[in-house]
From Swiss-Prot:
<feature type="active site" description="Nucleophile">
    <location>
        <position position="71"/>
    </location>
</feature>
<dbReference type="GO" id="GO:0090499">
    <property type="term" value="F:pimelyl-[acyl-carrier protein] methyl ester esterase activity"/>
</dbReference>
<keyword id="KW-0719">Serine esterase</keyword>
<feature type="binding site">
    <location>
        <begin position="138"/>
        <end position="142"/>
    </location>
    <ligand>
        <name>substrate</name>
    </ligand>
</feature>
<feature type="binding site">
    <location>
        <begin position="71"/>
        <end position="72"/>
    </location>
    <ligand>
        <name>substrate</name>
    </ligand>
</feature>
<keyword id="KW-0378">Hydrolase</keyword>
<feature type="active site">
    <location>
        <position position="202"/>
    </location>
</feature>
<dbReference type="GO" id="GO:0005737">
    <property type="term" value="C:cytoplasm"/>
</dbReference>
<keyword id="KW-0093">Biotin biosynthesis</keyword>
<dbReference type="InterPro" id="IPR050266">
    <property type="entry name" value="AB_hydrolase_sf"/>
</dbReference>
<dbReference type="InterPro" id="IPR010076">
    <property type="entry name" value="BioH"/>
</dbReference>
<keyword id="KW-0963">Cytoplasm</keyword>
<dbReference type="InterPro" id="IPR000073">
    <property type="entry name" value="AB_hydrolase_1"/>
</dbReference>
<dbReference type="GO" id="GO:0016020">
    <property type="term" value="C:membrane"/>
</dbReference>
<feature type="binding site">
    <location>
        <position position="12"/>
    </location>
    <ligand>
        <name>substrate</name>
    </ligand>
</feature>
<comment type="pathway">
    <text>Cofactor biosynthesis; biotin biosynthesis.</text>
</comment>
<comment type="similarity">
    <text>Belongs to the AB hydrolase superfamily. Carboxylesterase BioH family.</text>
</comment>
Amino acid sequence: MNRPDLVLLHGWGLGPQVWSALTPYLPAGLRVRTPALPGHGGTPARGPTLEAWSDALLPELPDDAVVCGWSLGGLVALDLARRHPHKVARLVLIGTSPCFVTRPENAAAPWPYGLAASTVTGFIDDFAHDPAATLRRFVALQALGDARRRTVSNALNAALANLEQCRPAALGAGLELLADTDWRAALDDVRQPVQLIHGAGDALMPLAAAEWLATRLPDARLARFDDCGHAPFLSHPEDCAVLIEDVVRG
């Protein structure tokens, strides 16, 4: 029986090269695709909705793929699985939360597991004035809480989106997607098996969000890395590759 293709979706402000630490540990012969998100790495920009970003990736996806999304890429992967289930056989979600921003207790649907709205708004405003500095600051947050912080920081900085090849407006739209998206109500529609991978020290998307997600998705399990931040596939690529291979093998 042929193994499915593996599609790796990177996070905001970075490029497909962020997967270069992981791919050497994946099984030989596995077909791996690493498309760029809209507006990243010279790809065309799309509308400011998660659905538009997901649909832009459809030509890159074979049927019945295993889709592995990290951070914003994880939200895109969830949307693909819900709206295009023939494209997504199984999911791997790394450092992914259904809702990036906290919602207050008096909101219709409170959510305590995220960044404060003021922090994210600050990122959006700062990016509009100084994209390069904001990207570097975002990368620094992703490495926090990791025992191999320097290794992670170096890998992330090497994979930073080249602003000369990117569309700043599209990158700004990606930040707004993170700020505005609340995917909790749609989780029951994801019927595919899901492997969650999360760092206990994640400073962007707290572990509690992944723990909540694991209880709400119909078919999910969570692998926790105690000494990791937001990018466990960079600090523990071999361990993450083993988990991904298990998903690919079904």
